[in-house]
Amino acid sequence: MGLIDFLRNKTKTAETAKNRLQIIIAQERTQRGGPDYLPLLQRELLEVIKKYVKIDANAVKVDLIKDGANDVLDISVALPDDSER
């Protein structure tokens, strides 16, 4: 029976690890201060802009700014000179 009890404890260990990981993820989200969709939004905006203008990956910046009770989505796109388009 000791072997069966040993194997059952692994499920508790896995559950404990899962709970710890969820806590770590929640803490990282709180520290970042932004929702999870911002990196995806930035990549999708970059792909749409690349259809029309040649820009590098660092040309699009998306930030969420908290202004009192309001949240402001700040999108900055650095466009190249006319000669580089």
Swiss-Prot record:
Query: Which InterPro entries does the record match to this protein?
Result: MinE, MinE_sf
List keywords of the entry alphabetically: Cell cycle, Cell division
Annotated coiled-coil segments of the chain? none
Q: Which SUPFAM superfamilies match?
A: Cell division protein MinE topological specificity domain
In terms of Gene3D superfamilies, this protein maps to: Cell division topological specificity factor MinE (3.30.1070.10)
The highest taxon in the source lineage is Bacteria
Q: Which GO terms describe its biological process?
A: cell division; regulation of division septum assembly
Q: Establish whether keyword Cell wall biogenesis/degradation is in the entry.
A: no
What's this chain's function? Prevents the cell division inhibition by proteins MinC and MinD at internal division sites while permitting inhibition at polar sites. This ensures cell division at the proper site by restricting the formation of a division septum at the midpoint of the long axis of the cell.
Question: To which protein family does this belong?
Answer: Belongs to the MinE family.
Quote the NCBIfam families the UniProt record gives: minE (TIGR01215), PRK00296.1 (NF001422)
User: Which named protein is this?
Assistant: Cell division topological specificity factor
Give the species this sequence originates from: Xylella fastidiosa (strain M12)
